[in-house]
A protein has these predicted regions:
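N-terminal carbohydrate-binding accessory modules
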Residues: 1-38, 57
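Substrate-binding/catalytic cleft of secreted carbohydrate-active enzymes
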Residues: 33-36, 43-253
Length: 254
């Protein structure tokens, strides 16, 4: 940034708060950013969609860097769509255009991300080309198809796999982990081990912990009257639930 190397000490963030779900007020946004800054976090990934416009204004105000990500994900069907299928090309490009045209003047944004876990193929080559033509000043990112973007991005790679990149014959791109140190339960205990590697060589540029806040809803226990944060199958629906995969945050829902 501005000619100086930047180590990304980042976190992925869903728009969420424990009392109102995905309706996040400006006060909560400010609290999020202040907590991030207090904990030495300097960048946030808008996983996995462009965020409320106010969020970017606050990131500009506080000095928090942003990887802005298009709302493109085909997690459950990435073996089929969009890949090279021309009928999906307009939708893929439309998502890039909507992201860039809305937020291109936000100084906090340092990187455009094509999407998340959405297969590979010609459509992503076209998306990367579109982003570079519209804004050659910012980096491009897409983890599944690293050859078309400016970054060599991975998810949840081990320390040994990170070290292997040092001897990889085509290691010309900056290496980052767009998701790592999955914050589920009693985890993230070996974070210092990761940072020892990241700080050992200039080719490593940090990463984004998964993720910022537990996606849980403030609920009253009908038996005790006490407040607790419910998630997963707490409402009795065991078939259609993410179970504890919704509680991966570094911080609680409140």
């Amino acid at each position: 940034v501005n000619g100086k190397k930047l180590m990304l000490r980042g976190v992925n963030r869903h728009e969420f708060t424990g009392d109102k779900g995905r309706v996040v007020s400006e006060d909560v946004m400010r609290k999020d950013i202040e907590l991030m800054k207090q904990n030495n976090i300097n960048t946030v990934r808008s996983s996995h969609y462009p965020n409320d416009p106010k969020w970017y204004d606050l990131c500009d105000e506080y000095g928090l860097y942003v990887m802005d990500e298009a709302n493109l994900e085909t997690h459950g069907r990435l073996d089929e769509i969009p890949q090279d299928r021309v009928e999906w090309t307009p939708a893929v490009i439309d998502r890039q255009e909507a992201m860039v045209e809305r937020s291109k003047n936000e100084p906090s944004i340092i990187m455009w991300s094509i999407g998340n876990e959405s297969s590979t193929g010609k459509n992503f080559e076209l998306a990367a080309k579109y982003l570079k033509e519209k804004d050659p000043t910012r980096l491009t990112h897409y983890e599944p198809q690293r050859d078309i973007t400016d970054t060599y991005s991975r998810m949840y790679r081990s320390i040994e796999e990170m070290k292997a990149y040092l001897v990889y014959e085509d290691n010309t791109k900056p290496y980052l982990q767009c998701e790592f140190a999955h914050g589920m339960g009693n985890s993230i205990g070996n974070l210092q081990d990761y940072w020892d590697v990241m700080e050992s060589n200039e080719i490593f540029h940090g990463g984004y912990i998964w993720d910022w806040v537990d996606q849980a809803i403030e609920t009253i226990d009908p038996k005790t009257g006490e407040k607790y944060f419910a998630y997963g199958g707490d409402w009795g629906d065991e078939e259609f639930t993410d179970k504890n995969f919704s509680a991966n945050g570094l911080i609680f829902a409140d």
